[in-house]
């Protein structure tokens, strides 16, 4: 099953105590949105070690670009309900690419018709 990893899942997976999450990710066919690259690497307080880890992760990842279709879908989502730009673009990417969105923030996305959302912490 191909999944789209939300930014929070990428961050949690880097923490030593989340070995089960890393195993979950390895068992699926993960992709990430280009928005997650900006959200994770753009965090101003990353240590050098954290930055290196995430850069290596993204280098090895399948990164999905923000297409015109994704932009159109994100606009539609934001017109329906207040949500962050990042969440709108990530949700729209999952919708347009027909991917399961893996996130810990189910409430931020659960209202979106047709979007499949999975919280790996709830299933472990």
Model-predicted regions and their roles:
Residues 3, 29-32, 60, 64, ...:
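Short loop->beta-strand "edge-of-pocket" segments that line small-molecule binding or catalytic clefts
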Residues 59-80:
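Acidic catalytic patch
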């Amino acid at each position: 099953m191909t999944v789209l990893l939300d930014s929070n899942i990428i961050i949690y997976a880097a923490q030593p105590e989340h070995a089960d999450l890393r195993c979950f990710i390895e068992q699926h066919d993960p992709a990430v949105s280009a928005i997650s690259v900006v959200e994770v690497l753009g965090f101003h307080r990353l240590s050098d070690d954290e930055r290196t880890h995430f850069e290596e992760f993204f280098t090895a990842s399948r990164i999905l670009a923000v297409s015109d279709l994704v932009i159109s879908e994100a606009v539609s989502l934001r017109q329906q309900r207040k949500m962050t730009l990042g969440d709108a673009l990530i949700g729209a990417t999952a919708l347009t690419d027909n991917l399961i969105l893996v996130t810990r923030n189910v409430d931020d996305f659960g209202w979106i018709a047709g979007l499949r959302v999975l919280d790996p912490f709830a299933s472990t």
